[in-house]
Amino acid sequence: GCIGRNESQKKDNVYKFKE
């Protein structure tokens, strides 16, 4: 996921990165 994001946004980015 992206660094420097809020927890909720960080998790959302992690899911997008994994996909």
Swiss-Prot record:
- Described purpose of this protein according to its UniProt entry: Antagonist of L-type calcium channels (Cav1/CACNA1).
- Tell me the protein's name: U7-ctenitoxin-Pn1b
Q: Which GO terms describe its cellular component?
A: extracellular region
Q: Does the keyword Transmembrane helix apply?
A: no
Localization, per the record, is:
Secreted
Tell me the tissue specificity. Expressed by the venom gland.
Q: Indicate yes or no for the key word Secreted.
A: yes
Keywords, ordered alphabetically: Calcium channel impairing toxin, Ion channel impairing toxin, Neurotoxin, Secreted, Toxin, Voltage-gated calcium channel impairing toxin
Give the Gene Ontology MF terms in alphabetical order.
calcium channel regulator activity; toxin activity
State the coiled-coil residue ranges: none
